[in-house]
Regions:
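Non-catalytic DNA-recognition/assembly elements of restriction-modification systems
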Residues: 1-13, 169, 173-179, 184
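Low-complexity, Lys/Gly-biased intrinsically disordered segments
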Residues: 1-39, 53
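Conserved loop->alpha-helix
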Residues: 38, 114-116
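Short, structured motif recognition centered on aromatic/hydrophobic residues
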Residues: 3, 25, 61, 67, ...
Length: 196
């Protein structure tokens, strides 16, 4: 199935230029999507309510939308977990899955080597390479039945939790092993003096 058939819509962020304001709505870009997470920096560029409303007059970002970077570092993904009032620049694609695919499955499938290769093959040869929406829509993705998608997502979510737990716990584990090494090293290299 092509991506367009699995989504209610496939859009990208704004192509317009907007005046920066001190207090307003964050205008985010591809640099704000890393390791499956959308980050909203406190010092992010802000736009006015009028500009924000103009960008999203036809739709709003909502929980469950899948974001994909399509300019610069192409192919990084994140799921919008909570309703947020942010706008995106053209470097971010916004995918709203339809009833044939879950957000989590789409998030994971777009990270696979096969889908990443497809994305890379669609990059335009411009100054800052990117994937146009017409090409993004044509990405072929395997879509199993919903029950199978949920089973796959459940397994991948568990692996993700384990990986993140390991990453978070790794420095402490390394420190424990270093202390253990020092203890046994000292034990092995401490000799009783003759006559003592």
């Amino acid at each position: 199935m092509i991506l367009r058939e699995a989504c209610e819509f496939v859009k990208d962020g704004t192509h317009g230029s907007y005046k920066n304001v001190d207090n307003g709505y964050p205008l985010l870009s591809a640099k704000d999507i890393n390791n499956g997470v959308l980050t909203i920096p406190t010092n992010s560029r802000k736009i006015s309510k009028i500009d924000f409303d103009d960008i999203y007059k036809n739709y709003k970002i909502k929980s469950g939308d899948v974001l994909i970077t399509i300019v610069g570092s192409v192919g990084r993904t994140a799921i919008v977990r909570d309703f947020i009032d942010v706008a995106f620049q053209r470097s971010v694609g916004i995918l709203r899955p339809n009833n044939k695919v879950t957000s989590s499955f789409l998030f994971y499938i777009l990270q696979t080597t096969q889908q990443q290769k497809q994305l890379m093959s669609k990059i335009s040869k411009s100054a800052q390479g990117g994937v146009y929406l017409g090409e993004l829509n044509k990405i072929v993705i395997p879509i199993p039945p919903l029950e199978e998608q949920q089973r796959i997502v459940s397994i991948l979510d568990r692996f993700d939790r384990i990986t993140n737990d390991l990453t978070a716990g790794l420095p402490a584990e390394i420190e424990k092993r270093r202390q253990q090494y020092e203890y046994y090293r000292d034990k092995l290299l401490t000799f009783k003096r003759k006559g003592a």
